[in-house]
Amino acid sequence: MKYPKQIRTYCPYCKRHTIHKVERVKRRPRSELSAGQRRFRRVLKGYGGFPRPKPEGREKPVKKLDLRFVCTVCGRAHTRGKGFRVKRFELVEV
């Protein structure tokens, strides 16, 4: 899918439509010090198998895109709804 590098959309911080720069964001590594991760490590300790049953069905073939829109006026970034699944993604100059 081809997506423009710049797009005119609503900025929730300026409260008006401005030109936004589109950025694709990569996922950061999961924090090992978060409360949930510490709890999970505690459950895994000791003898026995994995504490949860295997998930049913197969894994999705493609991850969802994480797009950030950076306002050229105020410089703040925001997302626009939820991400969508796409196999190939390319930012192009329009």
Swiss-Prot record:
It comes from the Archaea. It holds the Pfam family Ribosomal_L44. Its cofactor is Zn(2+). Binds 1 zinc ion per subunit. GO terms for cellular component: ribonucleoprotein complex; ribosome. Keywords: Metal-binding, Ribonucleoprotein, Ribosomal protein, RNA-binding, rRNA-binding, Zinc, Zinc-finger. PROSITE patterns: RIBOSOMAL_L44E. Zn(2+) binds at residues 11, 14, 71, 74. SUPFAM superfamilies: Zn-binding ribosomal proteins. A zinc finger (C4-type) spans 11-74. GO terms for molecular function: large ribosomal subunit rRNA binding; structural constituent of ribosome; zinc ion binding. One of its GO terms (biological process) is translation. InterPro entries: Ribosomal_eL44, Ribosomal_LSU_eL42, Ribosomal_zn-bd. Part of the 50S ribosomal subunit. Belongs to the eukaryotic ribosomal protein eL42 family. Binds to the 23S rRNA. This is Large ribosomal subunit protein eL42. The gene is rpl44e.
